[in-house]
Amino acid sequence: VGGERGEEVLKNNPHVFKMIPHDKNVKNELLGQHIDWLKRKYHCDRVIDLNESVECALSQHPRSADYKLPKNERIAKFNRNFYEYCFEHSKELWDSTTDFTPELFFDQKEMDEARKYLKPDCYNVLVGLSGSGNNKAYPWMMDLCNNIGKTHPNVHIITVGDMKCKILEDIETPDLTNVTKLSGEIPMRISMALTSMVNLVISPDTGLLHAAGCYPTPKIALYGHNTHEVISKHFTNVHPIQADEKLAPCSPCLLMIYEPKQQCPLSYSTNSSICMADGIPLQTVYNKFVEVYNAGL
């Protein structure tokens, strides 16, 4: 059972027999009863309810009693890998030999559609501009792209995100000429398919990063409120950059952030979450890009 996003993620998955669309009219407080009704209707032997399994259980919701725990206590209690926790929550046995690598499944039409955005004679870099929450956006991402374009003209940058990310794409980048801007222009599945084809993915904590985690594609992951342990511990070829606690003392907070302007300390320069704006200097990400780029030559 899932919504439109769930259908996109699970499309073509051979392990999924049937996808039941979530009824958006069901109130949150009645979800338990609704799922029990679906179990009976579809004659299911077992229910694994992932509602609030990670969100609220690990990422603390403002209504949670642990939301206001001191940071060190919060980290000690909740800095746990999401994939491992979902296995525990589902009462599935696992140990150090379990393969937690995520999987996506694309048909040939989707792969062909994604491939047409590549430039075969270039080093293709897929850049995710934002995540589901505004606090995940890295405000210097287009500046990073501009710097890369200035020093590495053979790099072709592909930017992806939702319609709101077009605002970021419109930032002036005079040295960035080898770029394809696709925010709001292509389906999420095509963005996810691209993570298997490009030379490098640069992304904050987003679905795009989890998609890249399915493949050995090198990836630079930017973390403000979350950590490498929580998100990408089981990914291969991942180069995590954690916000500097000296620059953003709140990071990592491991909290559910719905409204950064109410929940987060804000950067004076961008009026956005301090962990991403001030905690991750542009030069730090650029240096990591150069390191990964040179290693791949």
How would you name each of these model-derived features?
Residues 1-297:
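Catalytic machinery of carbohydrate-active enzymes
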